[in-house]
């Protein structure tokens, strides 16, 4: 809806806020720099990653967990009069129940996650953040599971943004990705 903010901005001297699918700090900067709006509002982007502004400020935009535009946990939930949430951030609405920091495992272990779909990648990320040595195996040649198929219809390609996020995170956490490799005894012996 940035084009609407830009149209309104040209009609008066009042402050204008751009809102809607502002996913990356570069996009927010461009809106302000090009005077399309005076401010930007982040809604769903902050549900997906509450640390969005802090990460942008410290130059860590690549680590921002992206909103994938599915509207299931946020907008759909509101329309159904249900508690809001976020498909890519399971902590939304439960922050008060969770520890302030991810606790390091007392005894780090070798962990194997079978399946490189979004759930498997999320599990691998959390295990690695807790200090475990993590390997992920999947019989498919690429990570993503059913998400790859779900992203094929027109207008759904940004579903892949969460896969790209996980792959970048897991690379930074030194997670051992074993794609095109089904689970078998030989694989278990090599870990």
Predicted segment positions?
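Beta1-alpha1 glycine-rich phosphate/pyrophosphate-binding loop at the start
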Residues: 113-180
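Flavin-dependent oxidoreductase catalytic cores
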Residues: 1-114, 118, 122-134, 142, ...
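A conserved short coil-to-beta-strand element within the FAD-binding core of flavoproteins
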Residues: 178-191
């Amino acid at each position: 809806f940035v084009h609407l903010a830009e149209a309104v901005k040209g009609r008066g001297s009042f402050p204008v806020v751009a809102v809607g699918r502002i996913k990356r700090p570069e996009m927010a900067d461009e809106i302000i720099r090009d005077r399309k709006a005076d401010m930007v509002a982040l809604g769903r982007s902050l549900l997906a990653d509450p640390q969005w502004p802090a990460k942008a400020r410290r130059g860590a935009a690549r680590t921002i967990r992206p909103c994938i535009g599915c509207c299931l946990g946020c907008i759909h939930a509101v329309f159904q009069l249900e508690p809001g949430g976020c498909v890519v951030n399971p902590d939304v609405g439960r922050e008060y129940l969770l520890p302030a920091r991810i606790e390091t495992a007392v005894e780090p272990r070798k962990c194997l996650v079978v399946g490189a779909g979004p759930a498997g990648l999320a599990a691998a990320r959390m295990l690695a953040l807790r200090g475990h040595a993590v390997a992920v195996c999947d019989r498919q040649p690429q990570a993503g599971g059913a998400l790859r198929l779900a992203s094929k219809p027109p207008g759904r390609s940004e579903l892949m943004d969460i896969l790209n996020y996980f792959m970048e995170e897991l690379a930074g956490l030194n997670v051992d990705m074993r794609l095109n490799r089904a689970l078998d005894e030989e694989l278990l012996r090599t870990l």
